[in-house]
UniProtKB/Swiss-Prot annotation:
The holdase activity is activated by HOCl, via the reversible chlorination of several residues in the TPR domain. Chorination probably increases the hydrophobicity of CnoX and enables it to bind a variety of substrates. Reduced glutathione (GSH) is required to resolve CnoX-substrate complexes. This is Chaperedoxin. Transmembrane segments: none annotated. Chaperedoxin that combines a chaperone activity with a redox-protective function. Involved in the protection against hypochlorous acid (HOCl), the active ingredient of bleach, which kills bacteria by causing protein aggregation. Functions as an efficient holdase chaperone that protects the substrates of the major folding systems GroEL/GroES and DnaK/DnaJ/GrpE from aggregation. In addition, it prevents the irreversible oxidation of its substrates through the formation of mixed disulfide complexes. After bleach stress, it transfers its substrates to the GroEL/GroES and DnaK/DnaJ/GrpE foldases. Changing C38A: Still fully activated as a holdase by HOCl. One of its GO terms (cellular component) is cytosol. The gene is cnoX. InterPro entries: Thioredoxin-like_sf (IPR036249), Thioredoxin_domain (IPR013766), TPR-like_helical_dom_sf (IPR011990). One of its GO terms (molecular function) is unfolded protein binding. GO terms for biological process: cell redox homeostasis; cellular response to oxidative stress; chaperone-mediated protein folding; maintenance of unfolded protein; protein refolding. It comes from Escherichia coli (strain K12).
Length: 284
């Protein structure tokens, strides 16, 4: 099987692979074609190496061809598997094992899915690519049962995207022990965003809408302004109030704006999901 993170060990690459374990866990697999157990274990290990996609290196050592190296490890049985991390063996087993047991062994040292997603998101945040970081952090936050540290990253990203309402909702879930100076800084940023979001244009449109509550075109203008400053729930509620009465309000512009805001929020957004369901109920 040809996978980049599967290597066949020999005298020339043994030291290099051991050094690689300083940064990436290495699963050393000592096998022999004479062993029936290896016939069962080899495809399991190779399949896991492919599934984990570079999170660990599978280092295979043919004990018949590389007897000198095998002797250095003082093997007592074949197959034997050692898990190396930071240049040292940290776990292992002898004989056949089910896939679940091997996964459990790997999961002790490999980062969890939410950690990987958070790491990817942090890299994107460093590049100021908050749009692509957002879905990764949403997933990571849910996978981690709303971990406080990931929650702060999510709130920071939402603030950068001018979505103060959503950021505030996330910060409300942060446990007391995680409400440090960074948390306080994010709260302060949200307050500044809120102040900036109450623009004179919005205030004027709000007054006009209050005076002309049946004017869907005016309400659509206001909703667009609210969306642009991150006040999405207010915008959607305003638009939906008119759609509830007339799906073709403002010559269809109200529904078009409503759907554009939903699209901008993304498929995984809770607020967007809520209003998509409400629109669907109106349509069908």
């Amino acid at each position: 099987m040809s996978v980049e993170n599967i290597v066949n060990i020999n005298e020339s690459n043994l030291q290099q692979v051991l050094e690689q374990s300083m940064t990436t866990p290495v699963l050393f697999y000592f096998w022999s074609e004479r062993s029936q157990h290896c016939l069962q274990l080899t495809p399991i290990l190779e399949s896991l190496a492919a599934q984990y996609n570079g999170q660990f290196i599978l280092a295979k050592l043919d004990c018949d061809a590389e007897q000198m190296i095998a002797a250095q490890f003082g093997l007592r049985a074949i197959p034997t598997v050692y898990l190396f991390q930071n240049g040292q063996p940290v776990d292992g087993f002898q004989g056949p094992q089910p896939e679940e047991a091997i996964r459990a062994l790997l999961d002790k040292v490999l980062p969890r899915e939410e950690e990987l997603k958070a790491q990817q998101a942090m890299q994107l945040m460093q590049e100021s690519n908050y749009t692509d970081a957002l879905p990764l952090l949403k997933d990571a936050w849910q996978l981690s049962n709303q971990n406080g540290e990931i929650g702060l990253l999510l709130a920071e990203t939402l603030i950068a995207l001018n979505r103060s309402e959503d950021a505030e909702a996330v910060l409300k879930t942060i446990p007391l022990q995680d409400q440090d100076t960074r948390y306080q800084g994010l709260v302060a940023q949200i307050e500044l965003l809120k102040q900036a979001a109450d623009t004179p244009e919005i205030q004027q449109l709000q007054q006009q809408v209050a005076e002309n509550p049946e004017d869907a075109a005016l309400a659509t203008q206001l909703a667009l302004q609210l969306h642009q400053v991150g006040r999405n729930e207010e915008a959607l509620e305003l638009l939906f109030g008119h759609l509830r009465k007339d799906l073709t309000a403002a010559d269809g512009q109200t529904r078009k704006t409503f759907q554009e805001i939903l699209a901008a929020l993304g498929t995984g957004d809770a607020l967007a999901s809520k209003y998509r369901r409400q629109l669907y109920a109106l349509l069908y």
